[in-house]
């Protein structure tokens, strides 16, 4: 993306979205709005709290969009309390077949597509040129709506559905988690503010797939955040 654009960022307070917000500022973009979605996810309480703190730290406008009807999609363990989120030994982040199986458990129908379209509507209304989500190459292998191809196709769709032809860009879509951590470290991201866990709690659980990927990424980058994990 060219520098000095007005942008809307999607901010879940996870590793990827937080680093993208910091990188957008580094590229001299004006973040006119940071959007966080409450769609009934298990980690909603912590995500909303952490996102607000990150936005405050960056000095950018922040808005929470309520999407209660996502609960109608009752097959995802991220939304349904009586369905177990895969954790611990049930998660093998280096096993592609196993990762595809666990991905099905936490998949929410068209979640990222809906998020991008809502963000694009805000972008057009606020005179912004682009929407910046937080994606990564590691999870794109099992979640196609994290891929660069998805970003490209979303931009093509928005050319027709927004009068100012809002684009979708992401600074981390080509990177794996360890490289995103290194990028964030260079940007001086305050890691204690992020929330990369599938659950709410006092600390990151350390056992869900998102935590296991984050744990490995921080270790690979030689950054000690053990105190932020429950286990």
Curated annotation (Swiss-Prot):
Residues involved in Zn(2+) binding: 197, 205, 208, 211
Cofactor(s) listed: Zn(2+)
Chain positions recorded as ATP binding sites: 11-21
Note describing how the cofactor binds: Binds 1 zinc ion per subunit.
Pathway this chain belongs to: Purine metabolism; 7-cyano-7-deazaguanine biosynthesis
EC number: 6.3.4.20
GO molecular function, one term: ligase activity, forming carbon-nitrogen bonds
GO annotation terms (biological process): queuosine biosynthetic process
PANTHER family: 7-CYANO-7-DEAZAGUANINE SYNTHASE
Record protein name field: 7-cyano-7-deazaguanine synthase
Organism: Bdellovibrio bacteriovorus (strain ATCC 15356 / DSM 50701 / NCIMB 9529 / HD100)
